[in-house]
Amino acid sequence: MNGIRLFVGLGNPGAQYEDTRHNAGFWWIDQLCAQTASKTTLEAKFFGLSGRLNGHADTWLLKPTTFMNASGRAVAALARFYKIPAEQILVVHDELDLPPGAARLKKGGGHSGHNGLKDIAAQLGTNDFWRLRLGIGHPGDRSAVVNYVLNAPLRDEMQQIAYAMDDSMLVLPQLLEGKFEEAMLKLHTKTK
């Protein structure tokens, strides 16, 4: 099997961060759990909430509880334990460079200043993992980024982000089967 075996949603733990833009990856995993009747539970050895994707015994879900900037510790722990190579990992995260409502799938590349991605690459020893980038928009000023990602999106932005998450759920079968080109074509055509 060459499809995704580990879906990771990035975010920060705690009620004060629950509704912030930086938690878009957590929202995505929560939606995936709701749609597939899957569950995650706290697993200390994986530094996060983890569980199997319902109906797919070899596919895991993970929400690191290490805080965003140390997400790699959780990802590497689970990936090494279950012998999941980087190319079978999909990390779902907020993306400043995309507007709300956009979702883009890509493999590898830089971290674009996203410290969660930076730590995952460092802990795995490679950038060669898949990313699902959920657009949250940009505040327009670089100095406002930290405050922006740690605040909740406006109602219309949240609606657009929800649409992008819905669209990305439609390519789940392709992701599980390793049909990444097909998934990208379908997703990138759907969310413009």
From Swiss-Prot:
Source superkingdom: Bacteria
Example GO molecular function: peptidyl-tRNA hydrolase activity
Major subcellular site: cytoplasm
Keyword Hydrolase: yes
Keywords, alphabetical: Cytoplasm, Hydrolase, RNA-binding, tRNA-binding
Gene Ontology cellular-component terms listed: cytoplasm
Xref: SUPFAM superfamilies: Peptidyl-tRNA hydrolase-like
UniProt keyword annotation of Manganese present: no
Site entry: Stabilizes the basic form of H active site to accept a proton: D94
EC identifiers of the protein: 3.1.1.29
NCBIfam families: pth
Protein name, as recorded: Peptidyl-tRNA hydrolase
